[in-house]
């Protein structure tokens, strides 16, 4: 149905989630992350009705009309594009332009949530009222390091690692402008 996002409830089960992580090669797969990702697809379907959005989308993310099933089959059989860190927030984002959008959207929301939570709880210094994404990215770089150390100290995997470079920054900025934040 239109506007319905379906997430398999089994993903909340740790054993199932680990099997999914291994099967999909997504080290940081979580229910919350999957929901963010799928919400990106939903909002893309709405935003893609606007010609101006589509035009800019193609310039930044690529041609969304590339054969989707073939792109995913290629990704799962051969892996991500070798240079994925130079242009994408995750290996999976390199599989298809709409997956790149959904992964970027999801990562954008994760950064906003983590930074706003850390600032609100005063875990890191900064202005919780400043919603400028460039400012929040600068906070994220400090917060990410702290989260890596805390997680490793507790015996957990670190947080997702991705490069904030001109390509990913441009994609984050496009997501933010599309949201109208």
Task: Give the residues covered by each predicted segment.
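Short glycine/proline-rich turn/loop motifs
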Residues: 16-23, 82-89, 126-128
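Pan-zinc metallopeptidase signature
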Residues: 92-181
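Auxiliary, metal-adjacent structural segments of Zn-dependent hydrolase domains
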Residues: 1-14, 25
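Active-site recognition of the HExxH zinc-binding catalytic motif
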Residues: 29-49, 102
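Post-HExxH zinc-binding segment in Zn-dependent metallohydrolases
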Residues: 46-115
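Short pre-active-site segment immediately N-terminal to the catalytic Zn-binding motif
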Residues: 14-36
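Short, positively charged
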Residues: 13-15, 77-78
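Generic structural hydrophobic/aromatic packing signal, biased to beta-strands
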Residues: 4-9, 37, 57, 84, ...
């Amino acid at each position: 149905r239109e506007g319905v996002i379906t997430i398999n409830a089994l993903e909340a089960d740790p054993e199932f989630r680990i099997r999914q992580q291994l099967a999909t090669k997504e080290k940081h797969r979580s229910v919350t992350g999957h929901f963010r990702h799928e919400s990106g697809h939903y909002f893309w379907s709405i935003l893609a009705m606007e010609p101006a959005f589509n035009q800019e989308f193609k310039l930044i993310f690529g041609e969304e009309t590339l054969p989707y099933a073939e792109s995913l089959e290629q990704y799962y059989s051969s892996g991500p594009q070798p240079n994925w860190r130079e242009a994408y927030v995750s290996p999976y984002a390199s599989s298809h332009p709409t997956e790149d959008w959904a992964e970027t959207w999801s990562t954008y929301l994760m950064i906003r949530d983590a930074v706003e939570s850390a600032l609100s709880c005063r875990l890191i210094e900064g202005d919780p009222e400043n919603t400028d994404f460039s400012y929040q990215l600068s906070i994220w770089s400090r917060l990410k390091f702290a989260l890596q150390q805390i997680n490793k100290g507790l015996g957990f995997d670190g947080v997702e690692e991705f490069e904030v470079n001109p390509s990913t920054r441009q994609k984050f900025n496009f997501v933010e402008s599309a949201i109208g934040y």
